[in-house]
Amino acid sequence: MLAGDFSRNLHKPLLFIDKDTKVVIQGIGNQGQFHSRLMRQYGTKVVGAVHPKKAGTIIAGLPIFKNMKEVVKRTDANASLIFVPAPGAAAACIEAAEAGMGLVVCITEHIPQHDMIKVKKVMKETGCQLIGPNCPGLIQPGTHTKLGIIPTNIFNNGKIGIVSRSGTLTYEAAYATTLAGLGQSTVVGIGGDPFAGQLHTDVVKRFAADPQTEGIILIGEIGGTSEEDAAEWIAKTKLTQEKPVVASIAGATAPPGKRMGHAGAIVSGGKGTAEGKYKALEAAGVRIARHPGNMGKFIFEEMKRMGKI
């Protein structure tokens, strides 16, 4: 359906990562060290880290390089995971993109919105894909590859693609699909900030084009129009005639004008409500799970109805 959308990026994995993804860590403090170890234990190829003052040393079993250009030259890294604190995170994203990274995953929260506008401009100019900021990352059980802080024990290789603004609801959906025997193809936490890199539509398009992904769970939050935009694309392409989609939106009871956890989770001017998102998604043929505990049950029922299990 969508091969043309990605024809210019044939050298990049359709679902962002694969078994050959080589990862560099930017921000090798306590959290960077801890999660780099977990990533390697899972099977991810973490090839080094960047710290301008500690180049030439070994930290947490990783060789340390002075800058991103050096690490790319020495290791052929093609993806970066950023744990740099908020004041320097935008500069780290830009450095990674300009060094030729195909993918940047930014875990950092509280990056100024003005900084993120600059980051998104550079990402567009370089063709680098940004996931985040303020996200848990992504995981691909079939290749044992993950970038981020996602716990691995609840995932199993399978058929369902999950895209989510909420970290914890990502894990809820993953565990439910594992228990249902469906498993996951790739799971992407896009983050809850107003200026996120990948939005729901960007990821859903990739799931639609991926033959292993046979069903999709979309998890949104109040605020913004990412979910409505995805609903418009799903309706336009009649995606639900080919692959079932189940959606759940967090924040249905949030009072207008009050931020709920994530910087982007705020209803203002009568826009971004949970009901508005549900209405748009339902009109596109998406099955709605108003309680997140039903996500696994509903996607199982939809997969069975369409003869996919």
Curated annotation (Swiss-Prot):
Signal peptide start and end residues: none
A GO BP entry is: tricarboxylic acid cycle
Record Pfam families: CoA_binding, Ligase_CoA
Q: Name one GO molecular function term.
A: succinate-CoA ligase (GDP-forming) activity
SUPFAM superfamilies associated with the record: NAD(P)-binding Rossmann-fold domains, Succinyl-CoA synthetase domains
Gene Ontology CC terms, in alphabetical order: hydrogenosome lumen; mitochondrion; succinate-CoA ligase complex (ADP-forming)
Catalytic residue positions: H262
The source's domain of life comes to: Eukaryota
UniProt binding sites for CoA = K54, I107, T108, E109
Q: Where in the cell is it found?
A: Hydrogenosome lumen
Q: How does it assemble?
A: Heterodimer of an alpha and a beta subunit.
Name by which UniProt lists this protein: Succinate--CoA ligase [ADP-forming] subunit alpha-1, mitochondrial
According to its UniProt entry, this protein's organism is: Trichomonas vaginalis
